[in-house]
């Protein structure tokens, strides 16, 4: 996806450009991985394409070459990459994607050369149906026993056959308390209500993501984020279109930096991005992250092995490494996203565990939805969102 060392992040934190430069310095570009795989995808990709396999048998800790990781940017502590490289004596090459649709398009093009990818929940179901994922050898992932019960039977992959959970969180609204007051209402109205948004006209951002942003509009209107009713989707698209004049941008890259940099006052985005930005800028008292009372998206990002992964055993070993209790805690302490790793809880910073915006209480969680694969309606989400933005 990225050209050279350019990184287009979804979960960009204000560890920001320094971390991005450090990662870029120790990572290959997508071009380099494609070259290793034999070309830029499709049937003409070259003679050294990996042979697709539906399953593999590996020993715990076994490696069969380097690790090619395709992840969201700024979504893993660089020290974990270094520790994995040193412990197993393998190189790690990282590339980054900005959203699930870009991820899918890249993998569908063929011969990506990637081993482990980090798709969100609903995308696992889509890729599984298309035969793009390898069935995991759970014998090679003994730390799978650390996965919390809530994450052991998800609807998109009920038996954890094709994925392991990585991180989870929510998508909501962050506001400047200078604008919103000390006790801001938890509502999507900060974006969609013209009266609430009147004083912050031009200082609002929304994610440049069809399912997330259409989902926010759907919940504000009282519908499911997974609606397949054309009239409801059109109503949501119309609401977004009416909102565009109030927006500074549709942005999935810098929204948290823009907020803490006081260029915007309200931002739609991912929980952990905001918390990391507040922490890095020592601005916890200046901003609030809100899970809207109308309901919002709860998501879980996952680790999966591609069906044509060149190094499937190294891939399994990496997944097992991340599922280690202390490594899982290190990941959460760095990203500020909730961990699906039950064994990691004792090593996670207490302030994170106690924060209801990171680990929502039951009454809030009851109004959260996972984004699901809506089949043929996916195209409608994409097309209507594109029309609304224009």
What function would you assign to each model-found segment?
Residues 257, 362-390:
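Conserved C-terminal helix/tail region of periplasmic/extracytoplasmic solute-binding proteins
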Residues 123-126, 266-285:
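A ligand-binding cleft/hinge motif common to bilobed small-molecule-binding domains
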Residues 306-365:
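Mature extracytoplasmic/periplasmic domains
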Residues 172-179, 220-222, 299-314, 321, ...:
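A bilobed periplasmic-binding-protein/Venus flytrap-type ligand-binding module shared by bacterial periplasmic
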Residues 68-71, 75-77, 102, 113, ...:
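Extracytoplasmic ligand-binding site segments that recognize negatively charged/polar headgroups
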Residues 1-24:
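Sec-dependent bacterial lipoprotein signal peptides
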Residues 146, 233-242, 248, 283-309:
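Periplasmic-binding protein-like
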Residues 26-28, 41, 46-126:
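Early extracytoplasmic/lumenal segment of secretory-pathway proteins
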């Amino acid at each position: 996806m990225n050209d050279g060392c350019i990184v287009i992040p979804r979960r960009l934190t204000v560890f920001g450009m320094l971390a991005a430069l450090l990662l870029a310095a120790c990572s290959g570009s997508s071009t380099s991985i494609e070259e290793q795989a034999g070309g830029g995808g499709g049937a003409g990709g070259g003679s050294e394409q990996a042979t697709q396999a539906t399953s593999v048998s590996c020993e715990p800790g076994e490696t069969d070459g380097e690790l090619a990781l395709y992840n969201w940017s700024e979504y893993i502590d660089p020290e974990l990459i270094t520790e994995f490289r040193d412990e197993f004596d393998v190189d790690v090459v990282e590339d980054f994607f900005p959203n699930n649709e870009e991820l899918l398009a890249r993998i569908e093009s063929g011969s990506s050369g990637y081993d482990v990818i980090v798709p969100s929940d609903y995308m696992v179901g889509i890729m599984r149906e298309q035969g793009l994922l390898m069935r995991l050898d759970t014998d090679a992932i003994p730390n799978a026993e650390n996965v919390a019960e809530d994450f052991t039977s998800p609807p998109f992959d009920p038996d954890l056959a094709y994925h392991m959970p990585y991180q989870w969180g929510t998508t909501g609204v962050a506001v400047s308390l200078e604008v919103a007051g000390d006790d801001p209402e938890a509502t999507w109205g900060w974006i969609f209500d013209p009266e609430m948004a009147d004083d912050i006209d031009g200082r609002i951002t929304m994610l440049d993501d069809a399912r997330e942003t259409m989902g926010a509009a759907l919940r504000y209107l009282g519908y499911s984020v997974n609606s397949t009713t054309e009239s409801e989707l059109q109503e949501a698209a119309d609401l977004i279109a009416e909102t565009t004049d109030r927006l500074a941008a549709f942005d999935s890259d810098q929204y948290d930096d823009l907020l803490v940099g006081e260029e915007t006052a309200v931002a739609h985005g991912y929980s952990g991005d905001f918390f990391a930005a507040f922490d890095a800028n020592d601005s916890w008292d200046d901003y609030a992250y809100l899970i809207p009372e109308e309901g919002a998206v709860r998501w879980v990002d996952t680790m999966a092995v591609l069906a044509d992964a060149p190094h499937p055993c190294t891939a399994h070993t990496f997944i097992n490494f991340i599922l280690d209790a202390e490594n899982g805690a290190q990941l959460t302490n760095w990203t500020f996203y909730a961990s699906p790793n039950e064994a990691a809880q004792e090593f996670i910073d207490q302030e994170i565990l106690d924060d209801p915006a990171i680990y929502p209480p039951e009454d809030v969680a009851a109004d959260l939805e996972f984004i699901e694969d809506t089949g043929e309606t996916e195209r409608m989400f994409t097309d209507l969102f594109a029309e609304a933005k224009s």
